[in-house]
């Protein structure tokens, strides 16, 4: 027999017996009765954002700000999911995927600075995998570093080619 006081441990992906939007309604009702601001913990509000997102992906809804109790008595679960999904979708469209400069990194591999010009290729691939994991800031940082290193090694390769051609044609035979 389960103890009603202690919560049962569950898998992170499974749904709880109490739906999170219903839990939020209960918390806002308590807030209205006591006339005190009830701060939701970060883990609870994060779980609410994840569940209302409808995708179970770790996207934060930044444009929502602080949660306000709804004016209607009991909004349906589907409507709260739809509204949150619209906010998340519009936020995701505002931030475009950063460039990884993979073509530039591959082009730098043809320059004569051979072991060093693999470094921008590695950073470019790391940037692409960061985008797939959802880390846009890290992907942007790695993409910029890949671009900087690619351009640097292309310029260094051109300098090496110019020096080699100059030395080859100016040395008397």
UniProtKB/Swiss-Prot annotation:
Extracellular compartment spans: 172-173
Start and end residues of each stretch annotated as Disordered: 1-22
Subcellular location per the Swiss-Prot or TrEMBL entry: Cell membrane; Endomembrane system; Cytoplasm, Perinuclear region
Stated name of the protein: Trafficking regulator of GLUT4 1
BP-aspect Gene Ontology terms: cellular response to insulin stimulus; endosome to plasma membrane protein transport; establishment of localization in cell; glucose import in response to insulin stimulus; protein localization to plasma membrane; vesicle fusion to plasma membrane
GO cellular component: cytoplasmic vesicle membrane; endomembrane system; membrane; perinuclear region of cytoplasm; plasma membrane
Membrane-spanning segments: 151-171
């Amino acid at each position: 027999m389960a103890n009603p006081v202690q919560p049962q441990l569950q898998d992170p992906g499974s749904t709880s017996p109490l739906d999170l939007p219903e839990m939020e309604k209960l918390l806002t009702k308590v807030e209205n009765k006591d006339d005190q601001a009830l701060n939701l913990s970060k883990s609870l509000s994060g779980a609410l954002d994840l569940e209302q997102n409808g995708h179970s992906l770790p996207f934060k809804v930044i444009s929502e700000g602080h949660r306000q109790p709804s004016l209607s008595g009991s909004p349906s679960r589907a409507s709260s999911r739809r509204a949150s999904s619209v906010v998340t979708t519009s936020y995701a469209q505002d931030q475009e995927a950063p460039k990884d400069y993979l073509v530039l990194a591959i082009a730098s591999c043809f320059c004569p600075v051979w072991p060093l010009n693999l470094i921008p290729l590695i950073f470019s691939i790391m940037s692409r995998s960061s985008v797939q994991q959802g880390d846009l800031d890290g992907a942007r940082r790695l993409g910029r570093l890949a671009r900087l290193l690619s351009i640097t090694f292309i310029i260094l390769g051109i300098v090496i080619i110019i020096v080699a051609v100059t030395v080859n044609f100016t040395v008397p035979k």
